[in-house]
Amino acid sequence: MIRRLFIGIVASLACLTSWAQELELDSIQATDMMVELKELVVKGGLPNTRLKGNAMITRVEGTPLAQSGTLGEMLVKVPGMTGTEDSPEVLGKGAPLIYINGRLLRDDSELKRLRSEDIRDVEVINNPGAQYDATVRAVVRIRTKRQQGEGLSLDLTATTEQDLRYGFNRPSGKLGLNYRTGGVDVFGSVYYFHQDYRQYSWLEETTNTTKLFHQEGPYTMTWKNNLLTYTAGVNWQINDNHSVGVRADLTQFLGGTNMVIFDEDVFENNIRIDHLYSEQTSKETKPLGILTNAYYNGTAGKLGIDFNFDFLSTEINTARENVENSLVNDDFVLSGSGTESRLYATKLVLSYPVWKGMLEAGTEMTFARRHNTYWIDKPTIADTDADIKEDNIATFVEYGTDFGQWGKASVGLRYEHTLFDYKDDMNSDYLHRSMHEFFPTAAYSVRLGNVQTALSYSLKTNRPSFFAMNDAVTYISRYSMQSGNSQLLNERLHDLTLSASWQWLTLTASYGRCKHVITQWSFVSDDDAALIKHINLDRPVNTLGAYIAFTPRVGIWSLNATAGVEKQDLYLDLEDPHVQGGMRRAYFDKPVYTLNAFNTFSLKHDWRFDINFMLRSHGHQLNFYDDYDNMRLNLIVQKTFLKDKALTLRAAVLDALQRNHMNEYGDMGYYKIQQNNRYSTHKFQFTVIYRLNATRSKYKGTGAGKDAQQRMKN
């Protein structure tokens, strides 16, 4: 089925190419120097999007995207992207690495702190080359506006979000200062955020072994915390060939409490045997978190040099109380956990022109240390005191060349040596792995008439997060527990991506084959408790995706829309004692459809209205099925004031239809789970933005050790 679909997509691309070549349209002329590289600039609508190799570059400055709000709100509107403002994704590729002026975005709160007005353009790379970590399936590179001017500038933003259904409020604010003189740029900011988030769910679990065991009932999850983020840095542009800089992000956690409430009935062979009401309260403390980056960027003759050094230090301690009221017996359970993480990373990229192209080579080294502890006052669950050590040393080389009218091509190879040690002093568990892996990449792009096309291939991997490898059993309730798995294998993914762009239309199709897929599975204990832990599937997963983006503009109205489908080919043979032979085959192959439509109406006197609609249909993702069509409708109005447009007022109703839901069903043979989630996203949002003498930071650090940093956060 997937093969026939893929052949059909390729045939459609061929027809599009032929049709476009027959059209007698005037070629698009532009003053941008990049046109000289024979890239296709897509006009006829905003934002302007062009295909460059296997990357889509979207201009933000001077388009309706520039007034989207926060960086996160803008990214979900960029062609080739989807997701939410808190978790943007690249279509068909998942969460990307995000760079801002070459610096890795290491703190997700920057998605809220940075404004879309500051952005010049966004580059979406849907199949990154050998320079990037082998775990990276997509990269988003953001460039801010290059404004001239010196002196002091101020940037003040204040936002309040009022939940329209449950009544709570979530304020945030940022004060940023920038001072520029000559080639020196000094910047700093303070950001405050109050988190108040609710999730309301209905949970059903059925275990069908020698007896039928069933649990059902509502549960509520609440997260509340306050944090301050301090940012400071300096950039020195020595001359046109040399620049250096350093940046530090300090996060002060002001305390937080999470609460999970279960209220469920328990049945055995259709007879109620218990009613459990459980309150789990978690109080978190975190010392000051440190994220730093230092860089040098320059040239020595024809040799380009890009060097980065990163350091990360985080710690979190959690104390939990479980109060359980039951028909069988009441209980009070105490537990606690702690995590300390340290990371040192460095990356060096050298570039040199060779023949008609550019040769890039370099190295990246990451050294990660993590210490996990867990204790509980129940003798049936073991305590944990584990050390995790992971060292990754990589070298890479990539060469790209331009064949003129015959197109551009690049090939690359990345070698990674990974050393992993896991040791638990409480139970003598020890695991040692030493891996040597090669990851090839290749890309080819050519313009066929008025159509720009690109084809790319890469071999990728996905390493489990440090949380997923933690063997400690976390107590949720007497019927539910959770654990990691230090025996997990890395995923191996072959990725083939085809792109085509014509005027304001862009089509992307991709095929992926993944082995050792990591997912969650349930195991049943002798006392009928469910243990959820991570496993590797024993079958590969084939996935096909196709997306089309179109960005027309008519008068005051501009549209940025994306439609697509993603389908996986997966079946599993599941243990089920109630079928003949004790095994049954389950198919997980229902496609997921996506439709995003971002409408902008730009009126006189600096008024602007936005109607943003996002739809994700029901369908399978790995061994889980979402049977709900998720919809989000956001209505936004904003007005700019003062002669220099320094003041902006913005009001929005988020999730106006209250359809941001998810109903997830998991089939694991003898164990089935249905979880229906309702999120607290129906809100009224009001934002005030004031800027004085706006300038932009010239910081050019790219960051290193990106994969390990992300896995520590997960």
Predicted regions mapped to residue ranges:
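Surface-exposed extracellular loop regions of Gram-negative outer-membrane beta-barrel proteins
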Residues: 144-160, 200-204, 216, 228-232, ...
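Outer-membrane beta-barrel signature, preferentially recognizing the C-terminal barrel domain
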Residues: 388, 430-435, 461-515, 530-545, ...
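N-terminal periplasmic accessory domains that precede
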Residues: 28, 39, 71-74, 109, ...
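Outer membrane beta-barrel strand-and-loop segments of large Gram-negative receptors
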Residues: 343-347, 394, 489, 506-596
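Short acidic/polar hinge/loop motifs at secondary-structure boundaries
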Residues: 77, 103-129
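Short, acidic, small-residue-rich periplasmic hinge/interaction motif at the N-terminus
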Residues: 22-64, 84-85, 93, 125-126
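Face-selective signature of the C-terminal outer-membrane beta-barrel domain
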Residues: 229-255, 279-424, 445-447, 452, ...
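Extracytoplasmic beta-strand/coil segments of soluble accessory domains associated
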Residues: 49, 72-104
